[in-house]
């Protein structure tokens, strides 16, 4: 099982990625983890990436694709892999195709932006314990206060509505085009490509976790 998981921030990709990886015995691969590991190990690509990052630059797609190809050679990828947060752009997707990185499925978890804003901006956290609440779906017994300690809850900066809207704007402009890219490739094929087109599946990410997980596994069966 080799797949790419697509969806907006707050769509629940992280939760479903964990279930998919457990079911199929595959690793979850993120570019951030790969970069950190390569820099720590001092590999040639890691050294190159560190120079760019230390200078405050963005690591090039060529380096990222090189890291991906190295990562896929590792033994834990023999049964497949799940890409999390990669590719983010059409050029990265094209580079993956040119590098003959095989993908069986592209799975999009679709959640309306209004639902994501409500889901994320309603989160409240007890910092010391990490306990999380939601003002609508999982409220504390007393508004704004942790159930166990009686200490105040906070809204993380990442969960503030303005921040959520900005992240969704970035997704809409940068990553949403991948949805069209992969759905068109899956529908039309491309005889010039070095790899077969993936199957493209779209599921609703609205509902409880069990319902969404059932949709995910159903989509990955055909």
From Swiss-Prot:
Q: Which UniProt keywords apply?
A: ATP-binding, Cytoplasm, Kinase, Nucleotide biosynthesis, Nucleotide-binding, Transferase
List, alphabetically, the Pfam families matched: ADK, ADK_lid
Q: Where is this region: NMP?
A: 30-59
Q: Which CDD domains match?
A: ADK (cd01428)
Query: Which species is the source of this protein?
Result: Ralstonia pickettii (strain 12J)
Q: Its family?
A: Belongs to the adenylate kinase family.
What is a GO molecular function of this protein? adenylate kinase activity
UniProt name for this protein: Adenylate kinase
Task: Determine the domain of life of the protein's source.
Answer: Bacteria
Query: What gene name is given for the protein in this entry?
Result: adk
What does the record list as GO biological process?
Answer: AMP salvage
């Amino acid at each position: 099982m080799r797949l790419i998981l697509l969806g907006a921030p707050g769509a629940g990709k992280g939760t479903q990625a964990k279930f998919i990886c457990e079911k199929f015995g595959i690793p979850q691969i993120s570019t951030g983890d790969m970069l950190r590991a390569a820099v720590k190990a001092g590999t040639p690509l890691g050294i190159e990436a560190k120079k760019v990052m230390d200078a405050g630059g963005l690591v090039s797609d060529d380096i990222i694709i090189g890291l991906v190809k190295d990562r896929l050679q590792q033994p834990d990828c023999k049964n497949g892999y799940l890409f999390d947060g990669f590719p983010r752009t059409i050029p990265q997707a094209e580079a993956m195709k040119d590098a003959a990185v095989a993908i069986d499925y592209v799975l999009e978890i679709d959640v309306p932006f209004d639902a994501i804003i409500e889901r994320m901006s309603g989160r409240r956290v007890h910092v010391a314990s990490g306990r999380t609440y939601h003002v609508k779906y999982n409220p504390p017994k007393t508004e704004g206060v942790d159930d166990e300690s009686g200490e105040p809850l906070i809204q993380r900066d990442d969960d503030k509505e303005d921040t959520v809207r900005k992240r969704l704007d970035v997704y809409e402009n940068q990553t949403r085009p991948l949805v069209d890219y992969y759905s068109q490739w899956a529908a039309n094929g491309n005889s010039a490509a070095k790899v077969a087109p993936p199957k493209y599946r779209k599921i609703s990410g609205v509902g409880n976790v069990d319902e969404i997980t059932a949709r995910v596994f159903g989509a990955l069966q055909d």
